[in-house]
Every structure is written in structure tokens, then in C-alpha cells.
């Protein structure tokens, strides 16, 4: 596609400076370091740096146009200037990659917790039902044979559209996307045409980014506002906000749940260390179901995935129930470590609600006389209001070993002290070094205890103010256990 074609009929408020020639566009990018001839440079202003400061370098490296919110009279190339830069970026990216979402069945999952598990479950079921799918999410982006880890739950528009286009090129027929509230607010998902929207749950998170809980909910509502009247709005009907989300969309409502009446409802729940058994009720029929994923919150995740697949693909419900028995949890989601002297789990839980769900689940698995030992911290430069609450959650269920998560720009000791201010009882220990914290937790555990290492899950790094180091909770656990042999 050439520059003239790309800019033709763009309906975002934008002004073009310079002569538009039919020169071929090679790429859309925000990285001035990797610019080549034929690229369009998008000069975004971020928290840490301003892309406009690198526009001249981008032009020197071969950029044929610059997209920005600020006109630069010293640039010798075409400039596309708009006050709605994020929407303009989304529209240009979608057009450049030939609107790939129109060629896929696109499922968007939003919610404070559960997005990753639900997205992996849907991909698993879609693939099993001959609907080969890609995935864009927190752990990785799966684009056919290509797997990418870039650290973004919801990538920026240029990358997101590029990934969707790669799925089309790889002959995939569906895309499952984790849609974060931040990604929605920053318009990263604008010009993605969703066929299905899924709501897992809504609890406190990201209040460092959103002004209030109401604004956080409003952000998530955007996904459902994007659905057409032929789409599906799949909502957890046990949520207080369920009605609000269903009223915000033109799409066909589909509900799931445990406590309230729903299109897909679980009853007669039984839990064990080997998973959950329940009766799935749909239109008066009962389907006995076994899931290897433990905990009530994972029953909700399974229900969401079944509802989406059954409604969208019209698969046999009994077939889906049978498939669920062989699902596997995503990496770092209540992931068991098999070689320990007691049960050890790695989990990504980093919000009060997620931590409560995981601790509650694991406590039910404790043998008589056993205790739950929880290693956890809180991320730096993130919502500080949840730090005390995290301590209060863990205190309900067991012994806490408070440590560092990803301190980022904050002092680790300050974060730990803020967490510990939430404890009422002195049933905790402090080990700021995360490896030492894991070592200590394992050293005090008996064979009747359960150890939970929470907060980082699948992550293989730890972020400090001046450096990011390699750090994998699973590897550290194995290293500590091997030292006992």
C-alpha cells in the first residue's frame, strides 16, 4: 500500500502537511531506532519519553512520514497531525494491514482476573473444534507457529493489527484477545471488530491509572460498546455489574454463573486437589463436568469458555464438556511444582481478589494440622491502595512472607512497609530479597503445609529502578529444592 492510498478517506480529525506521493509504505512504527526507508514514524508522547524528540532521527533513518499531535516545521517529510493521535494510529494500522479483524472471529476478554485462563481455554476449545486460533495476551502472543513475548497484555495498535494480519496469513480463523482496561482507554483496540465480548469479573485494580473504580468500569464497558447487534456479550451473571454491562451493548446477551440463574450455570460443585467436578446446566439439560483446574474461580473460567465456544461455533455441548477434562492451566496460573516435600504452587495473583481466590482454594486442600505459607509482594509504581488489602487477605488464610515483586522505580523496603501496615496479627515475616523469601518459606514448611509463591506467575524477570534482572519463581523454587538433596 502506498502513502496516498493509506491516507485516502481517513475520517479522524487530522491535517496533512507536505506533498503526498504514491511511495510504498513499508511499516508503521514508534521505534525510531529501527526505522528504514518507507516507514511511517508515529511520534507518541509516553510517560517516560516523547516520540516527537526522535522525529528528526526517524526522518534521517528513512521515515517517509511522521504521525503526531504536534506539527514540526523542521521536518522535510509529510506530517499527519491530529489531536486524536491514538485513534488515528488505530485507523491507519487497521487500514495498512487490510482490516485483518474482519477476516477472523475475534473474541475479546476483559475483567480484573481470569483473562489469561479464559483466553487459553477458549483457544484450546476453538482449536479442538477445528477453528484454528491465535491468541494475544499477558503470557505470550500466539500467531500460528510464531510466538512472541513483548510484556504487553494488549499491544499498541500498530503491533496488534500486525499480529492479527499475521494470524490471517497463517490461515487462522479466530483471534482471542485479552483486552485490558488500559488498552481500551488508550484506544489500542479501536478499529478491531469484535464478534464476542467476555466479562470475567470486576474488582479493584489499576487505580494508579484510572481516576476511580467507576472510571475503571467505564473503560471495560468500551469492549461491549464496540460489539455489533450480531455479536455476543458473554457476562458473568453473578457480578453486581452484570446488568450494567448487558445494557451497554447491542450484542446478543449470554450469561454464565453459579449463584444466579444463567444460560450456562454450574451446580453441585465438588473440589479436590485434582480439580473440580460440577453439573453444567443449560436449557434444562444437565451435563456432568470435570475440570482439572482447581478452585471455584476456575469453574467460572471454564463456564465462560464453554459458553463462548458453544454459542459461537455451535459445537456439541457434550463434546465441549468432554474436552474440558483434558485442559491445562496456563503457565504461572496455580501451577504446581511436583518435586517439593509439600505442595508448592506458583501463581500470578497480584490483586486482592485474585489472591483471596487462590488462598481460599488452597486452604481447602490443606490436611489437618497444615498451614498455608504465602510469599508475596506488590508492584512498584502501581496502585498503592491495594497494598494493605493484600496483607489483610493473606492474614485470613495463613502465614505471610512479605517480599519484593517488581519494585520498578520505588524503594522495595517502602513497598514492603506499606504492605505490612495492613497486618493486625504478627503472623508474617519480611524478606525483601525474593529469592531469600522463597528459600525461607520452603525451609519452614512441613509436609502437611502448602506453599504459594504469588504475584509473578509466568514472568521470567524482576524490574528494579535501574535494571531488570532474570528471575523466574519456578526456577528459584527448583534451585532451592535441589540444594536440600
Curated annotation (Swiss-Prot):
PTM field: Carboxylation is probably crucial for Mg(2+) binding and, consequently, for the gamma-phosphate positioning of ATP.
Origin superkingdom: Bacteria
Principal subcellular localization: cytoplasm
Cofactor: Mg(2+)
Single GO MF annotation: UDP-N-acetylmuramoylalanyl-D-glutamate-2,6-diaminopimelate ligase activity
Single biological process term from Gene Ontology: cell division
Residue sites binding UDP-N-acetyl-alpha-D-muramoyl-L-alanyl-D-glutamate per the record: 32, 153-154, 180, 188
Recorded metabolic or biological pathway in which this protein acts: Cell wall biogenesis; peptidoglycan biosynthesis
Record field: catalytic activity: UDP-N-acetyl-alpha-D-muramoyl-L-alanyl-D-glutamate + meso-2,6-diaminopimelate + ATP = UDP-N-acetyl-alpha-D-muramoyl-L-alanyl-gamma-D-glutamyl-meso-2,6-diaminopimelate + ADP + phosphate + H(+)
Keyword line: ATP-binding, Cell cycle, Cell division, Cell shape, Cell wall biogenesis/degradation, Cytoplasm, Ligase, Magnesium, Nucleotide-binding, Peptidoglycan synthesis
Pfam families: Mur_ligase, Mur_ligase_C, Mur_ligase_M
Documented EC number(s): 6.3.2.13
Binding site for meso-2,6-diaminopimelate: 382, 405-408, 455, 459
Motif, Meso-diaminopimelate recognition motif: chain positions: 405-408
Location within or outside the cell: Cytoplasm
Binding site for ATP: 111-117
NCBIfam families the record matches: murE (TIGR01085), PRK00139.1-4 (NF001126)
The name this protein goes by in its record: UDP-N-acetylmuramoyl-L-alanyl-D-glutamate--2,6-diaminopimelate ligase
Organism from which the protein derives: Chlamydia felis (strain Fe/C-56)
Gene: murE
Amino acid at each position: 500500500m502506498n502513502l496516498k492510498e493509506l491516507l485516502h478517506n481517513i475520517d479522524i480529525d487530522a491535517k496533512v502537511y507536505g506533498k503526498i506521493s504514491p511511495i510504498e509504505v513499508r511499516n508503521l512504527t514508534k521505534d525510531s531506532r529501527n526505522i528504514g526507508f518507507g516507514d511511517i514514524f508515529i511520534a507518541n508522547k509516553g510517560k517516560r519519553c516523547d516520540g516527537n524528540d526522535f522525529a528528526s532521527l526517524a526522518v534521517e533513518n528513512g521515515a517517509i512520514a511522521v504521525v503526531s499531535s504536534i506539527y514540526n516545521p523542521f521536518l522535510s517529510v509529510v506530517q499527519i497531525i491530529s489531536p486524536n493521535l491514538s485513534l488515528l494510529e488505530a485507523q491507519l494500522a487497521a487500514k495498512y494491514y487490510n482490516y485483518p479483524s474482519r477476516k477472523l472471529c475475534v473474541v475479546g476478554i476483559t475483567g480484573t482476573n481470569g483473562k489469561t485462563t479464559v483466553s487459553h481455554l477458549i483457544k484450546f476449545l476453538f482449536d479442538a473444534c477445528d477453528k484454528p486460533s491465535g491468541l494475544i495476551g499477558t503470557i505470550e502472543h500466539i500467531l500460528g507457529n510464531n510466538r512472541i513475548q513483548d510484556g504487553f497484555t494488549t499491544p499498541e495498535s500498530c503491533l496488534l493489527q500486525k499480529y492479527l494480519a499475521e494470524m490471517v496469513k497463517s490461515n487462522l480463523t479466530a483471534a482471542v484477545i485479552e483486552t485490558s482496561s488500559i488498552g481500551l482507554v488508550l484506544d489500542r483496540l479501536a478499529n478491531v471488530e469484535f464478534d464476542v465480548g467476555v466479562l470475567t469479573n470486576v474488582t479493584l485494580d489499576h487505580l494508579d491509572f484510572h481516576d476511580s473504580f467507576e472510571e475503571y468500569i467505564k473503560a471495560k464497558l468500551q469492549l461491549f460498546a464496540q460489539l455489533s447487534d450480531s455479536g455476543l456479550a458473554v457476562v458473568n451473571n453473578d457480578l453486581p455489574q452484570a446488568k450494567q454491562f448487558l445494557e451497554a451493548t447491542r450484542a446478543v446477551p449470554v450469561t454464565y454463573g453459579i449463584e444466579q440463574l444463567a444460560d450456562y450455570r454450574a451446580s453441585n460443585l465438588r473440589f479436590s486437589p485434582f480439580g473440580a467436578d460440577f453439573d453444567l446446566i443449560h436449557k434444562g439439560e444437565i451435563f456432568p463436568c470435570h475440570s482439572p483446574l482447581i478452585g471455584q474461580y476456575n469453574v467460572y473460567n471454564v463456564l465462560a469458555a464453554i459458553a463462548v465456544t458453544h454459542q459461537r461455533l455451535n459445537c456439541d455441548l457434550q463434546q465441549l464438556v468432554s474436552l474440558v477434562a483434558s485442559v491445562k492451566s496456563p503457565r504461572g496460573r496455580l501451577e504446581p511444582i511436583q518435586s517439593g516435600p509439600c505442595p508448592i504452587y506458583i501463581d500470578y495473583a497480584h490483586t486482592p481478589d485474585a489472591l483471596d481466590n487462590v488462598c481460599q482454594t488452597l486452604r481447602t486442600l490443606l490436611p489437618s494440622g497444615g498451614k498455608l505459607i504465602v510469599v508475596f509482594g506488590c508492584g512498584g509504581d502501581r496502585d498503592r491502595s491495594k497494598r494493605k488489602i493484600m496483607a489483610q487477605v493473606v492474614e485470613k488464610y495463613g502465614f505471610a512472607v512479605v517480599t519484593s515483586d517488581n519494585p520498578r522505580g520505588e524503594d522495595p523496603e517502602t513497598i514492603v512497609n506499606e504492605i505490612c501496615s495492613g497486618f493486625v496479627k504478627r503472623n508474617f515475616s519480611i524478606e525483601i530479597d525474593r529469592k531469600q523469601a522463597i528459600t525461607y518459606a520452603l525451609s519452614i514448611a512441613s509436609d502437611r503445609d502448602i506453599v504459594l509463591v504469588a504475584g509473578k506467575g509466568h514472568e521470567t524477570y524482576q524490574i528494579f529502578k535501574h535494571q531488570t534482572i532474570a528471575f523466574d519463581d519456578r526456577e528459584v523454587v527448583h534451585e532451592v529444592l535441589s540444594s536440600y538433596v
